[in-house]
Design a protein with these regions (language model features):
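Short coil/turn segments at the loop-to-beta-strand junctions that recur within blades
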Residues: 26-27, 65-73, 113-121, 171-175, ...
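Conserved blade-ending motifs and adjacent loop-strand segments that build the rim/top face
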Residues: 224-250, 287-322
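Beta-strand-rich domains and repeat architectures in extracellular enzymes and scaffolds
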Residues: 16-50
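Short beta-strand elements that form the blades of beta-propeller/WD-repeat-like
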Residues: 42-48, 87-94, 129-145, 193-214, ...
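Blade/loop signatures of beta-propeller domains
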Residues: 1-21
Length: 360
């Protein structure tokens, strides 16, 4: 794969584009800080320091919770909300506090403890009423101590009764790194990417692991894509060393295959050559990716000439549901040279436009 200033084509994996005009009030902040979600009725959720709820056509409805330090309030949203659409609720992590549980109508249900003794429970996501989670714990590695901070399992899965039904094994747990002894390490592991290819197929991939796994019900988890990296790219052993600070100058200069999104037609990914040459690419299923670029040319319609998928992937602001990818595009992008507005009342100062990419 090579870096190119020439945008790739959106039509390589996108079939059509739908635009949704969001209410102009309340104001939506920097799109790099907003996470998207959708419930079973098609209502939309924009998640940043608050969670705003919208109708399927973009009309603002309400904020899901009150800000404050009282019962059922959130004084500082720590991470994006974690939505269980099958049960119609969202977990919201209060800063330095347990999760608050709300219905998707905004009613406070209860506080959910996220700790067992000194071990924290991090809920990653819900899918079909399964809870995907992992444990995290602060430890201090002594100088010269060998460790793999991902532990023996990357994550675990509970069913709706709370029974653990699956653990995603770390087949590389024998790979260890030697700690230089520089202080506290968070036993958290690396980034885990995941999403929904369709309503009956979920995918998951721990960063720097070459396998994208898929499942329909967690009784059968199997490889969906096998990633073939070039020899210059960082591998899993590199990531193990990086997490404990056991790195060399050569390690720091390695190319990196970063976040991915598994699609039915292939793999959307971010790639880093160096700070000046990084971008997004698309690798077709059973094929090979040739280039990465900062932008993808919109060769499907005439509204927005290019879309910055590199930034959307890097900030994890893409939302994947069934055969769609959702993202926000700033309104002023539709007034740049070569663009045109999809709505007659849109202005450069309007809230961002929600874009739904229908995937091939």
């Amino acid at each position: 794969v090579e870096y190119s200033e020439t945008p790739q084509l959106l039509s390589d994996f996108v079939d059509s584009i739908e635009y949704i005009r969001l209410s102009d009030q309340p104001l939506i902040p920097d799109t790099r800080k907003v996470r998207l979600s959708e419930d079973v009725q098609g209502n939309l959720y924009l998640d940043f320091n608050e969670i705003y709820k919208y109708t399927p056509r973009g009309k603002y409805l309400k904020s899901l919770f009150k800000q404050g330090q009282g019962p059922g309030e959130i004084h500082a949203l720590f991470i994006p909300g974690i939505y269980n659409k099958a049960e119609n609720y969202v977990l919201v992590k209060n800063h330095n506090a347990p999760y608050n549980k709300y219905t998707l109508e905004g009613n406070f249900i209860k506080t959910v403890d996220a700790q067992i003794d000194s071990t924290n429970i991090e809920v990653l996501t819900y899918w079909k009423n399964y809870e995907i989670f992992r444990y995290e714990k602060d430890i201090i590695l002594q100088k010269g101590e060998a460790a793999n901070l991902d532990s023996a399992y990357f994550c675990q899965v509970k069913d709706k009764t709370g029974k653990i039904i699956y653990r995603l094994p770390n087949h590389h747990f024998d790979i260890k790194a030697t700690s230089p002894g520089r202080g506290t390490i968070v036993l958290l592991g690396g980034v885990i990417d995941y999403g929904e290819i369709n309503r009956n197929l979920f995918w998951i991939r721990p960063n720097y692991v070459d396998t994208v796994y898929s499942t329909s019900d967690w009784t059968d988890v199997r490889p969906y894509y096998i990633i073939q990296r070039n020899n210059r790219a960082a591998d899993y052993a590199w990531s193990v060393r990086m997490k404990v600070g056991d790195i060399t100058r050569e390690d720091a200069e390695r190319e990196q295959l970063c976040n991915v999104y598994a699609l039915k037609s292939g793999l959307l990914f971010n790639y880093l050559f160096n700070p000046k040459q990084q971008g997004a690419g698309f690798c077709p299923a059973n094929g090979k990716s040739k280039t990465i670029s900062r932008l993808f040319k919109n060769d499907i319609d005439s509204y927005c000439p290019s879309i910055d998928l590199w930034q959307a992937i890097a900030y994890k602001t893409l939302y994947q549901k069934e055969d769609y990818l959702y993202l926000l595009i700033d309104a002023f992008k539709f007034f740049e040279e070569g663009a045109k507005s999809p709505f007659p009342d849109l202005t450069e100062e309007s809230n961002p436009v929600l874009v739904k990419l229908k995937l091939k």
